Design a protein with these regions (language model features):
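Short, charged, low-complexity loops and linkers
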Residues: 1-5
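Short, charge-rich amphipathic interface segments used for partner binding and complex assembly
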Residues: 11-63
Length: 63
């Protein structure tokens, strides 16, 4: 994966994480435990994807 592709993907994922954080806040404000759990799982998934992109970029750079 090229550096620019990785950077673009991470930027997109950051936007998704920020939007997910807003959904988590909304779920907390409304007391919706189910929505809170769903959005927290989504956020964890997005963060894991960022980690995978970083590892792929570092591996490609080392090769």
């Amino acid at each position: 994966m090229s550096k620019s592709n990785a950077s673009a993907e991470i930027s997109g994922l950051q936007i998704c994480i920020v939007n997910t954080d807003a959904q988590i806040d909304a779920a907390l404000d409304s007391g919706d435990r189910r929505a809170f759990r769903v959005w927290c799982l989504r956020r964890a998934s997005l963060i894991a994807r960022v980690e995978r992109v970083l590892v792929e970029a570092a591996t490609a750079k080392a090769a």
